[in-house]
Swiss-Prot record:
InterPro entries: TNF_dom, TNFSF18, Tumour_necrosis_fac-like_dom
Function: Cytokine that binds to TNFRSF18/AITR/GITR. Regulates T-cell responses. Can function as costimulator and lower the threshold for T-cell activation and T-cell proliferation. Important for interactions between activated T-lymphocytes and endothelial cells. Mediates activation of NF-kappa-B. Triggers increased phosphorylation of STAT1 and up-regulates expression of VCAM1 and ICAM1. Promotes leukocyte adhesion to endothelial cells. Regulates migration of monocytes from the splenic reservoir to sites of inflammation.
Protein's UniProt keywords contain Aminoacyl-tRNA synthetase: no
Protein name per its UniProtKB record: Tumor necrosis factor ligand superfamily member 18
Disulfide bonds: C58-C78
Entry's Gene Ontology cellular component terms: cell surface; extracellular space; plasma membrane
Keywords assigned: Adaptive immunity, Cell membrane, Cytokine, Disulfide bond, Glycoprotein, Immunity, Membrane, Signal-anchor, Transmembrane, Transmembrane helix
Organism: Homo sapiens
Intervals, Extracellular compartment: 49-177
Gene3D superfamilies, sorted: 2.60.120.40
Membrane spanning stretches: 28-48
Cytoplasmic topological domain residue ranges: 1-27
GO BP field: adaptive immune response; cell-cell signaling; negative regulation of apoptotic process; negative regulation of T-helper 17 cell lineage commitment; positive regulation of cell adhesion; positive regulation of inflammatory response; positive regulation of leukocyte migration; positive regulation of macrophage chemotaxis
Subunit text: Homodimer. Homotrimer.
Amino acid sequence: MCLSHLENMPLSHSRTQGAQRSSWKLWLFCSIVMLLFLCSFSWLIFIFLQLETAKEPCMAKFGPLPSKWQMASSEPPCVNKVSDWKLEILQNGLYLIYGQVAPNANYNDVAPFEVRLYKNKDMIQTLTNKSKIQNVGGTYELHVGDTIDLIFNSEHQVLKNNTYWGIILLANPQFIS
C-alpha cells in the first residue's frame, strides 16, 4: 500500500469520536432543560398549594326582604353581624363582596342618591346612578377585625325588596412570613 493511497482513506475513527462528543453535549443540554422545567413546575405547584381554598363554605347575605342576615354555618365562622348593613371579619382571607342596589324612583328628599361600601373607615366603592339597578362589590383581601359596611344617604332611597348584599370567603392564604 502506498502512502498516497493512505492519505485518501477516510478516517472514520475521528468522525465517530466527534459524533459521540456532540451526542453527549446534546444529552447534557436536554437533561438540564428538563431539570429546569421540573423545578419550575414544582415551584408553581408549591405556590398554588399555599393559597388554600376555604374548607367549608363561609358566607353571609343580607336581604332582600325579609331584611335579615342569612349565614352559612361554618366552624370557625368567618364573619360576625354587627348591624343590619355591617359585618366584622373573623378570618383573614380573600373575600368576594357582592350586592345589588335598586333605587327608589319615588324618593324625592333633599339628600342625593348615594350608596357607599366601606372597609373600616375607608370608602371602597360609591354608587350614584339612581336611574337603574346597580351592582356593588368586588374581591378584597380582608383581615381579622376589618368591618364592611353598606351605607345609604337615606334608607328610603332604595327598594329593600330588591336590594341585597353578601360576602363569601374564597380562600385563606397561608403565606410563610
